[in-house]
From Swiss-Prot:
Flavin-dependent halogenase; part of the gene cluster that mediates the biosynthesis of aspirochlorine (or antibiotic A30641), an unusual halogenated spiro compound with distinctive antifungal properties due to selective inhibition of protein biosynthesis, and which is also active against bacteria, viruses, and murine tumor cells. The non-ribosomal peptide synthetase (NRPS) aclP is responsible the formation of the diketopiperazine (DKP) core from the condensation of 2 phenylalanine residues. The gene is aclH. Glycans are attached at residues 242, 303, 419, 458, 498. Chloride binds at residues 328-329. Its EC number is 1.14.14.-. InterPro entries: FAD-bd, FAD/NAD-bd_sf, Flavin-dep_Halogenase_NPB. Belongs to the flavin-dependent halogenase family. Disruption phenotype: Abolishes completely the formation of aspirochlorine and leads to the accumulation of dechloroaspirochlorine. Gene3D superfamilies: FAD/NAD(P)-binding domain (3.50.50.60). This is Flavin-dependent halogenase aclH. Residues 1-21 form the signal peptide. Pfam families: FAD_binding_3. The lineage of its organism: Eukaryota, Fungi, Dikarya, Ascomycota, Pezizomycotina.
Length: 549
């Protein structure tokens, strides 16, 4: 099969975001071509998945292939952020049997996704690099004023190193899934920006004969994450099905540079010394041996001012990336890939015009990035326990949008009109840090029982007063923990429910085979008094979190 001269949608990049978008579009009958520069299977970091991945994969009928492949099942994850006992997120307790995720070898998992796109009708080619994009000016369509001169993409040039072949392909839509290279963001839009508060460097390698966290318990084989004792970063330990264990060190770049300078250590010296001084990880390595060369990466966190323009969608790491702390990379990749596919279909089907589709996708990607950024910032603040300017480079519009969900709970008011201040951002992070505090299931059940028992006739404000008057100091702390866990939307890690109910510009996704697109949002009927109180407190209608509530 040869690369065609024309297609409806060209997807550049065959990682999770690109392969997912290509599969979703091809299943809708869209003429889709997927070009990947590397030859599969190809290496990639990011082995630990979130349970939400299963639900994204199920939408394109790919979950059963992951289940049968032999990857290590991930029933949860352990996080030791400070001197207190590690916290454990239990996927099975929250979602029931079959709610596990996986620890994957990315070269194999990504290849599964790439092949699946082809099996579902996309024309897929690896070893083919896209070198340039040609744009044409269009009138009357722009969302981001800074991109008004870009125009719409109409063709791409490609080359194949193995054969020496070269060519070009024209298209109606382009999806940029080129990973950290970010072809469109860095070469054409030139709108990528790094978060200076998350200037980290990571080094990692693969060990043989490493021990496992939780041996003899249902937690055996789950990833283990531990903070470095001086607060400069953290270490991951992820068992893989090929018999190796991925162990990585993520450290603030300034701290890593200072430690090397003070001790004369090499990158490998710093890596090994850090692991030796991380007790929980080191005790699992008494018989282990580092069997690979170290790999390194820096500048983990970046985003952009826009993730779409007319007839163009940017997905996955090509647009933004945070930090591997909560395994958010593949989650955000698949979410953005699905967003790209459904907004293209929405415009094609007439659900909305192209400008509205562009706006929806860009806001959806920005919101997902911002929510996970808040989670990571809260966790890193818990690790470092010191003031750091972690959100100096945030996207104000998207953070304002995400903060709309947080401010009423933190301030006890529904006022969401004013712009954010740095103090409010700090307050948000401080509040969300409470999500990492311990609260037993019994303690949470007791508090939620009291929430359900409130039957005030004085409206929501009266119900809030009655509730807080009925709670002890310890119960109020437990309530704060429950609220914080809902603010950081921990259920996003379990399923894709929130993907289908998030209202952006008055529209919600329609995730139906053969009808993929956007639909106008229709508000629900009046809620009950208890539901209203739960909503005001930021508590869930039903138990669906990786935490107890």
């Amino acid at each position: 099969m040869s690369i065609p001269n024309r297609c409806t949608v060209l997807v550049v990049g065959g990682g999770p975001a690109g392969s997912y978008a290509a599969a979703a579009l091809a299943r809708e009958g869209v003429d889709t071509v997927l070009l990947e520069a590397d030859v599969f299977p190809r290496y990639h970091i990011g082995e630990s998945m979130l349970p939400s991945i299963r639900h994204f994969l199920r939408f394109i009928d790919l979950d059963s292939k992951f289940d049968s492949y032999g990857f290590v099942n991930k029933n949860g994850a352990a996080f030791k952020l400070n001197s207190k006992p590690e916290a454990y997120t239990d996927f099975i307790a929250a979602g029931g049997p079959g709610s596990h995720a996986w620890n994957v070898v990315r070269s194999e998992a990504d290849h599964l996704m790439f092949k699946h796109a082809g099996e579902n009708g996309a024309q897929v080619f690896d070893g083919v690099k896209v070198n340039s994009i040609e744009f044409e000016q269009i009138d009357g369509l722009t969302v981001d004023p800074s991109l008004s001169e870009l125009g719409r993409p109409v063709s791409a040039t490609w080359s194949c190193k193995a054969t020496g072949g070269k060519g070009s392909i024209t298209f109606e839509y382009l999806i940029d899934a080129t990973g950290r290279a970010g072809l469109v963001s860095t070469k054409y839009m030139k709108n990528r920006r790094y978060n200076q508060g998350l200037k980290n460097v990571a080094s990692w390698g693969y060990w043989s004969n490493a021990g496992s966290y939780g041996v003899g318990t249902p937690r055996e084989g789950d990833p283990y994450f531990e903070a470095i004792e001086d607060g400069s970063g953290w270490v991951w330990l992820i068992p893989l099905h090929n018999g190796t264990t991925s162990i990585g060190v993520v450290m603030n770049q300034e701290a890593a540079t200072a430690k090397k300078r003070e001790t004369g250590a090499t990158t490998k010296d710093l890596y090994l010394n850090t692991i030796k001084n991380t007790p929980g990880v080191w005790q699992l390595l008494d018989k282990a041996e580092l069997q690979s060369d170290l790999k390194s990466a820096s500048d983990w966190s970046y985003n952009a001012s826009s993730y779409a323009s007319p007839y163009l969608r940017i997905v996955g790491d090509a647009g933004c990336f945070i930090d591997p702390f909560f395994s958010s990379g593949v989650h955000l990749a698949l979410a953005s890939g699905l967003s790209a596919a459904l907004t293209i279909r929405a415009a094609q089907r007439g659900d909305c015009d192209e400008q509205a589709a562009v706006s929806w996708h860009s806001k959806k990607v920005a919101e997902g990035y911002t929510r996970f950024l808040l989670v990571v910032m809260s966790a890193l603040k818990q690790i470092s326990d010191r003031e750091k300017p972690v959100l100096t480079d945030f996207d104000e519009d998207s953070f304002n949008r995400a903060f709309d969900f947080f401010r009423p709970i933190i301030q006890g008011t529904a006022d969401v009109d004013k712009n954010l201040t740095q103090a409010e951002i700090a307050q948000t992070i401080e509040f969300c840090v409470q999500a990492f505090q311990t609260a037993s299931t019994d303690e949470q059940d007791a508090v939620m029982t009291k929430v359900a028992a409130i039957n005030s006739q004085n409206g929501t404000e009266g119900a809030l007063r009655e509730l807080h008057a009925s709670l002890s100091a310890d119960e109020r702390r437990t309530l704060t923990t429950i609220q914080a866990r809902q603010i950081i939307r921990s259920e996003d890690q379990m399923n894709i429910d929130n993907f289908t109910i998030d209202v952006i510009d008055g529209m919600v996704p329609r995730l139906e085979r053969s009808s993929l697109g956007l639909a106008r949002f229709v508000p629900k009927a009046q809620t009950s008094r208890e539901d209203g109180l739960r909503a005001t407190l930021g508590l869930p209608e039903k138990q669906k979190s990786i935490f107890s509530y």
